[in-house]
């Protein structure tokens, strides 16, 4: 599943192409890709056609593009397991996985097509109302507005958000008896982190994935947050993690952070720090990868 770095790469790639562009038309080829859209608010196509788009924003794994509508609304996209948002020249023939197409015109770049491609259909697009943030601060990366889509309002801030409160997160951990990885994957407590970056950050911080969150000292919490930001930042700089063709940027190119992974997917291989074989254990219907020597309980 695309995590924070992958979604941020898409957001940054979309920004110059869609900011200030007008939506000329919309085609929906797969209604299941609108599962988060409320038809009572109006049809997806009618709510978008003729609207101007503003700078894309992101919180955690959610991406949205504000519209010039009144009342305020936005296109909300979640990539799910295999979703892609691609910028295409008019006339481009996409594969059979094309679910939604936006016809847009930018004052500088001319006409473009925005394609939502999704193999496994866990992703979605929707038009949603913008609501005030709980803390009154800008909603996420890419926006100065304290407004975010209603369906994103329950999502916590992510570690790369300038407004993320380290002390408040430490207080949350102090009240949680569950393992630290379970907390990191809870998008209502801290967002944007999935299996890959949880495993990589915990390895970097030398913390076992099942270590009780409440038992982490403040210095270890500071170390964990620092490693989360370092790992996410490096992944972002390297274009995200691509194991197959399912994750690509807006131009269809893959990221290469998979070459920098220390534990994820490396079970049986030697730890880059101590040489001990990396172990994979079942966890929440997925796997946790760790070094049994560097990350002791």
Curated annotation (Swiss-Prot):
Active site: 2 (schiff-base intermediate with dna), 3 (proton donor), 61 (proton donor), 286 (proton donor)
GO MF entries: 8-oxo-7,8-dihydroguanine DNA N-glycosylase activity; class I DNA-(apurinic or apyrimidinic site) endonuclease activity; damaged DNA binding; zinc ion binding
CDD domains reported in the protein's UniProt record: EcFpg-like_N (cd08966)
Keywords: DNA damage, DNA repair, DNA-binding, Glycosidase, Hydrolase, Lyase, Metal-binding, Multifunctional enzyme, Zinc, Zinc-finger
Note on cofactor: Binds 1 zinc ion per subunit.
Record-listed E.C. numbers: 3.2.2.23, 4.2.99.18
Family membership: Belongs to the FPG family.
Protein known as: Formamidopyrimidine-DNA glycosylase
Native species: Leifsonia xyli subsp. xyli (strain CTCB07)
């Amino acid at each position: 599943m695309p995590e924070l770095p992958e979604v941020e790469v898409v957001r940054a790639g979309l920004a110059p192409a869609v900011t200030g562009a007008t939506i000329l038309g919309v085609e929906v080829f797969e209604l299941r890709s609108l599962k988060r859209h409320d038809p009572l608010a109006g049809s997806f196509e009618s709510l978008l056609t003729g609207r101007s788009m503003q700078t894309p924003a992101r919180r955690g794994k959610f991406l949205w593009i504000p519209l010039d509508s009144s009342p305020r609304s936005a296109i909300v996209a979640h990539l799910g397991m295999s979703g892609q948002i691609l910028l295409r020249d008019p006339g481009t023939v996409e594969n059979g996985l094309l679910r939604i197409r936006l016809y847009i015109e930018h004052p500088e770049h001319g006409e473009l097509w925005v394609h939502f491609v999704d193999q496994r259909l866990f992703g979605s697009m929707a038009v949603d109302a913008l609501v005030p943030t709980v803390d009154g601060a800008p909603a996420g990366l890419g926006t100065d507005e304290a407004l975010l889509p209603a369906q994103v309002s329950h999502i916590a801030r992510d570690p790369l958000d300038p407004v993320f409160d380290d002390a408040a997160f430490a207080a949350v951990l102090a009240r949680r008896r569950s393992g630290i990885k379970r907390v990191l994957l809870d998008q209502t407590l801290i967002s944007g982190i999935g299996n890959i970056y949880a495993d990589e950050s915990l390895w970097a911080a030398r913390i076992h994935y099942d270590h009780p969150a409440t038992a982490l000292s403040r210095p270890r919490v500071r170390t964990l947050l620092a490693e989360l930001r370092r790992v996410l930042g490096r992944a972002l700089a390297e274009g995200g993690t691509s194991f197959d063709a399912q994750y690509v940027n807006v131009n269809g190119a893959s990221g290469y952070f998979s070459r920098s992974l220390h534990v994820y997917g490396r079970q049986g291989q030697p730890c880059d720090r101590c040489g001990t074989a990396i172990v994979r254990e079942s966890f929440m219907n997925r796997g946790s990868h760790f070094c049994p020597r560097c990350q002791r309980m």
